[in-house]
A protein has these predicted regions:
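Bacterial N-terminal signal peptides
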Residues: 32-43
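Bacterial signal peptide processing site
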Residues: 46-48
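Short, well-ordered beta-strand elements
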Residues: 57-66, 118-120, 140-143, 191-192, ...
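N-terminal lobe/hinge region of extracytoplasmic solute-binding protein
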Residues: 63-114, 237-241
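Aromatic- and charge-enriched surface segment that lines or borders ligand/interaction sites
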Residues: 108-159, 192, 285-288, 335-337
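Alpha-to-beta junction loops
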Residues: 140, 189-191, 290-299
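Local pocket/hinge segments that shape ligand/substrate recognition
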Residues: 157, 268, 296-375
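Gly/Pro-rich hinge or "lid" segments in bacterial periplasmic/extracellular proteins
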Residues: 166, 178, 188-189, 195-269, ...
């Protein structure tokens, strides 16, 4: 992923480590290690622009890429949806945007058993939903039950299969109580999660929106427990527990979120609003960026990378990004049912040429799904 970004002196929203600048948490998609160039352009326009007005207005203008299909954390399946959802909903843990190490989120602390199977999370007593309701451990259990409900058909339900007996409920047709899924609310502020196996990266996994809570009364009001496409995610209906509230959503135009006064750490949220602009064309995004309409873009066209490297080498910055591009073949149909054909395609794929001449973003040729040192 390639980004264009202008530096401003505001944080986007809550960052636990107050010494860190504004940033969106880095995203984890797949398992392979990539390098991401981030371009910082300093400079202004002759007339006041969105970027120049940002210091006074305290509004971040964010190029979103594609229009999110869902803003429901249990149905979303895209980076663009992720960028909006993390402004609206907070999970049990957060992360340091520089080290990616887990930090307290809705849970102010947690305990891990010696065998690594039992995690006990202590929910903040001052954590609230945007309508003022308290955030409780029961909300998380309800949310896990919802995303694992096979009738909801969530694409990311398998992210929760690490919970003990989660598969029995999700795939084998057992009822929640009968399956005895390893998610129990001991009381309003104590949540216990039991795993099938020790999972060293479990806390990092909780940063994925599939683990985020949904407001149970709102889900029930709109009959959304096992239905897709209900209106609970529209402005005025959306109840989240994150630093921002959904204010406006014009499809393929703008998604605006405004500061949530009920957020438990609202005092550290410097921005008053974020405006996300779904702009699928990387060239259009770049023009919007250069005109001062956007603070940052979602991507950069590969055919622009060489120019930017040659003409602005001092402002291109590469950052690590986790993601994997791969080819998938139908192994049951000719010719790919023949292992020799698959091997030939594998040997004929010049990964180095692809990253140097096609993607051009400093990506690393992938020989497997997991990069060295991660698995």
């Amino acid at each position: 992923m390639l980004l264009l970004a202008k530096c401003i002196s505001l944080r986007t929203f809550h960052v636990i480590n107050h010494s860190l600048p504004w940033t969106f948490p880095k995203r984890v998609i797949g398992h392979s290690f990539w390098l991401v160039p981030m371009l910082f352009l300093l400079g202004g326009c002759t007339a006041p622009s969105n970027v120049e007005n940002a210091i006074e207005d305290k509004i971040l203008h964010f190029g979103l890429g594609s229009e999110p299909q869902y803003l429901d954390p249990h149905l979303a399946s895209s980076v663009s949806a992720h960028n909006v959802i993390i402004a609206l909903i907070e999970g049990l843990v957060s992360e340091d945007p520089k080290t990616l190490k887990p930090l307290p989120g809705v849970a102010e602390s947690w305990d891990i058993s010696e065998d690594g199977l039992l995690y006990t999370f202590h929910i903040r007593k001052n954590a609230k939903w945007s309508n003022g309701d308290p955030v409780t451990a029961h909300d998380f259990v309800y949310s896990y039950r919802r995303i694992l409900n096979p009738n909801l058909a969530s694409q990311y339900a398998s992210m929760l299969h690490g919970l003990k007996n989660a598969r029995k409920y999700h795939e084998e047709g057992l009822k929640w109580e009968e399956a005895k899924v390893g998610a129990v609310a001991i009381d309003n502020h104590t949540l216990q999660l039991t795993l099938e196996n020790p999972t060293p990266y479990f806390l990092e996994l909780l940063n994925h929106y599939s683990w985020f809570p949904a407001h149970p009364p709102t889900i029930k009001k709109f009959d959304a427990f096992e239905k897709q496409g209900t209106p609970w995610t529209r402005p005025g209906n959306y109840v989240g527990n994150g630093p921002f509230i959904l204010y406006e959503h014009k499809v393929n135009s703008v998604i605006e979120v405004k500061k949530n006064p009920n957020y438990w750490d609202a005092e550290t949220v410097s921005l008053e609003a974020i405006r996300f602009y779904p702009i699928e064309s990387a060239d259009t995004e770049e023009r919007a960026f250069r005109s001062g309409f956007l603070h940052l873009t979602q991507t950069v066209s590969p055919d622009r990378i060489d120019f930017l490297k040659q003409n602005h080498p001092e402002i291109i910055h590469f950052e690590p990004y986790l993601g994997t591009y791969f080819y998938r073949f139908n192994l049951e149909e000719p010719p790919f049912d023949d292992v020799r054909v698959r091997l030939a395609f594998n040997l004929a794929t010049d990964r180095q040429a692809i990253v140097e001449k096609v993607t051009k973003g400093g990506q690393v040729p992938a020989r497997c799904f997991t990069p060295p040192g991660t698995g």
